């Protein structure tokens, strides 16, 4: 709605969720929003940004979605609970964390953060 020039693809393995996104896009006349029923590891279209929430460990997330990341400028964003030090240590050698943003969720007394990653140059 705010950025009509930005294409957004919401990928989910659950067909009903992808269909809901498609229906919402039609109802709201959002030509730039797409619901995609697929597994992230099957995507071949390059994306500038790939994000996830409650999906997988960081190593699995970057491994499974790597073929869809637009290299060399693409970035990954992963919402996690507390700072995932063990997952960061287990990342592939060519993947770097370049920012971790701590989040405060109103009404939720739990740690949350967003981890920003990219392929090392």
What are these regions (language model features)?
Residues 1-52, 62:
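Conserved SAM/SAH cofactor-binding pocket of Class I
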Residues 5, 83-121:
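Active-site capping/gating segments
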Residues 7, 32-34, 75, 96-99:
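Conserved beta-strand segments of alpha/beta enzyme cores
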Residues 13, 55, 79-83:
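Short strand-turn motif at the edge of the Rossmann-like AdoMet-binding core
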Residues 22, 62-66, 88-90:
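Short amphipathic alpha-helical segments
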Residues 43, 58-59, 84-85:
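Short, well-ordered alpha-helical microsegments
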Residues 60-76:
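A short glycine-rich, Lys/Arg-flanked "PGG" loop and its adjoining helix->strand segment in the class I
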Residues 72-86:
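Conserved beta-strand signature within the Rossmann-like core of class I S-adenosyl-L-methionine
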């Amino acid at each position: 709605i705010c950025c009509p020039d930005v294409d957004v693809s919401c990928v989910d393995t659950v067909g009903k969720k992808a269909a809901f996104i498609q229906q919402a896009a039609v109802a709201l006349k959002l030509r730039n929003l797409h619901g995609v029923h697929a597994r992230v590891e099957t995507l071949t279209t390059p994306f500038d940004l790939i994000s996830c929430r409650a999906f997988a460990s960081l190593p699995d997330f970057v491994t499974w979605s790597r073929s869809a990341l637009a290299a060399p400028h693409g970035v990954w964003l992963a919402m996690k609970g507390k700072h995932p030090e063990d997952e960061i240590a287990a990342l592939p050698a060519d993947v770097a964390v370049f920012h971790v943003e701590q989040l405060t969720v109103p009404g939720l007394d739990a740690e949350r953060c967003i981890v920003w990653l990219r392929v090392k140059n």
